[in-house]
UniProtKB/Swiss-Prot annotation:
Component of the dark-operative protochlorophyllide reductase (DPOR) that uses Mg-ATP and reduced ferredoxin to reduce ring D of protochlorophyllide (Pchlide) to form chlorophyllide a (Chlide). This reaction is light-independent. The NB-protein (ChlN-ChlB) is the catalytic component of the complex. Substrate binds at residues 432-433. It catalyses: chlorophyllide a + oxidized 2[4Fe-4S]-[ferredoxin] + 2 ADP + 2 phosphate = protochlorophyllide a + reduced 2[4Fe-4S]-[ferredoxin] + 2 ATP + 2 H2O. Its cofactor is [4Fe-4S] cluster. The gene is chlB. It comes from Pinus strobus (Eastern white pine). InterPro entries: ChlB/BchB/BchZ, LI-POR_suB-like_C, Nase/OxRdtase_comp1, P-CP_red_C, Protochl_reductB, Protochlorophyllide_Rdtase. This is Light-independent protochlorophyllide reductase subunit B. One of its GO terms (molecular function) is metal ion binding.
């Protein structure tokens, strides 16, 4: 646990809550002090869902500290069981309440005896893992719980080729759009989708997971532990190549064919779908990215430098797309997923000049300032860094703000995803003629405070000290302060605006 201005991956309980709120009819209870219960607001704002977030805080206050938590936790579990009638309740502490070292597992066991629904305790070490690792672990725990609970399983796989998509969850970066694109891809390949978990799935679904012929893991961050467990227990093959970019799309489809060919029955399907012809047709005619990478517009990027940073899946994929498919130099690429550093290094070692594995945003900012790239591809934090350094940034990974939870269709996976990524890359650079004109006219005059006005009156002149003072005011109120100050100066017949005039205008407005 650490105090930080910015965290790329949140605390462990956020990962558990993301998995719980992705399933249908599952309720999460967090044992937490006030301040740790921000997940409800965050999810409601970003996902813009009609329904309330199914998460409740069992508040740790002075009464709990004095008497102990057992009664309150058990009462909250039973209350939610009665009010919501969920299939499952997941209890999780937060990193703060974990300090109390209470035996919450014992509370869960007690509540399970009385409640009508299933109750489990999120088996996560809140001191050792972050949001991503906790989400991966919680999903595996839920799947394992229900498979163990089903003493007799129908392990007969489907006759037709079928797949489970594991790892699509709430607050994921473009996850819902990616899921739609994966559905389209699998339909084209004549592969039936058996289950999609956790997003939109029921906790009763895991018992049907072994019926599929293989598992598809679109993102390494969540779902890999579940796939490895299913592979160990039921011998289910899995494909973990992310279908992002034309080259990895082709590799993913070939791995899907290989997984299906392990069993004899899918031969019937492979006769109907020619995978190589499908890859060729989609790459040449559906995805415009392959054509665009050979166009004069993309050739304008030759010699441009970029910095890439994000989660392991997106950072590695975008790095390979930039370097391998678009011919853009990646000066530095990195990830905050330190637990997956070995895989990340293996993936991008031939595609970048420099590599960084860190969760310190200041370190990333220093590298960007040193490299001075033409564009950045990163998280919301790199977008802030880019604004400070006046470097354009395309957001390619979580954590992201609300503008990257778009209502429109913007997948990153699949062949439509290649088009979206090509657009993002192209729009993140200053265009060729724009670059030329900026050079001729010495760039945009954005550093200066705008002093133009629609009024026909002569505007008061701002001296250097007052301009500097105005520049310190936050942007969202700066224009209003400027207008009010100039109105005050005109009313007083002043031709110049000084710092003293600014203060006087503020006092007059407050009076």
């Amino acid at each position: 646990m650490k105090l930080a201005y910015w965290m790329y991956a949140g605390p462990a309980h956020i990962g558990t809550l993301r998995v719980a709120s992705s399933f249908k009819n599952v309720h999460a209870i967090m044992h937490a002090p006030l301040g740790d219960d921000y997940f409800n607001v965050m999810r409601s704002m970003l996902e813009r869902e009609r329904n309330f977030t199914p998460a409740t805080a069992s508040i740790v206050d002075r009464h709990v500290l004095a008497r102990g938590s057992r009664k309150r936790v058990v009462d909250n579990i039973l209350r939610k069981d009665k009010e919501e009638s969920p299939d499952l309740i997941i209890l999780t502490p937060t990193c703060t309440s974990s300090i109390l070292q209470e035996d919450l597992k014992n509370f869960v066991d007690r509540a399970s005896i009385i409640s009508d629904c299933n109750v489990i305790f999120a088996d996560v070490d809140h001191y050792q893992v972050n949001e991503i690792q906790a989400a991966d672990r919680t999903l595996e725990q839920v799947v394992r719980y229900y498979l163990d609970k089903s003493h007799t399983l129908d392990q007969f796989v489907t006759d037709a080729p079928s797949v489970n998509i594991i790892g699509i969850l709430t607050l994921g970066f473009h996850n819902r759009h990616d899921c739609r694109e994966l559905r389209r891809l699998l339909k084209d390949l004549d592969i039936r989708i058996n289950q999609i978990i956790p997003e939109g799935g029921s906790v009763e679904d895991p018992k049907n997971l072994p019926k599929a012929r293989f598992n598809l893991i679109p993102y390494r961050e969540v779902g890999l532990m579940t796939a490895m467990y299913l592979n160990k227990e039921f011998g289910m093959p899995y494909v973990s190549t992310t279908p992002m970019g034309a080259v990895d799309m082709a590799e993913c489809i070939r791995q899907i064919k290989k997984s299906l060919d392990i069993l004899a029955a899918p031969i019937l399907s492979s006769k109907r779908v020619d995978y190589e012809s499908y890859i060729d047709g989609q790459t040449r005619f559906v995805s415009q990215a392959a054509w665009f990478s050979r166009s004069i517009d993309c050739q304008n990027f030759t010699g441009k430098e970029t910095v890439v940073f994000g989660d392991a899946t997106h950072a590695a994929s975008i790095t390979k797309i930039l370097a391998r498919e678009m011919g853009i130099r990646v000066s530095c690429t990195g990830t905050y997923c330190k637990h997956d550093a070995e895989w990340f290094k293996e993936q991008i070692q031939d595609f970048c000049d420099e590599m960084i594995i860190t969760d310190d945003h200041a370190e990333v900012g220093d590298i960007i300032a040193r490299v001075e790239p033409s564009a950045i591809f990163g998280t919301q934090m790199e977008r802030h860094i880019g604004k400070r350094l006046e470097i354009p940034c395309g957001v390619i990974s979580a954590p992201a703000h609300i503008q990257n939870f778009s209502l429109g269709y913007r997948p990153f996976l699949g062949y439509e995803g290649t088009n979206q990524i090509a657009d993002l890359v192209y729009n993140s650079f200053a265009l060729g003629m724009e670059d030329h004109l900026l050079e001729i006219f010495c760039g945009h005059d954005t550093k200066e405070i705008m002093t133009k006005s629609l009024s026909t009156d002569i505007s008061p002149i701002w001296d250097p000290e007052s301009r500097q003072e105005l520049g310190k005011i936050p942007r969202f109120v700066r224009d209003e302060v400027k207008i009010n100050t100039e109105k005050f100066a005109r009313r007083k017949g002043l031709l110049n605006v000084t710092v003293e005039v600014m203060h006087a205008a503020k006092e007059a407005l407050s009076a």
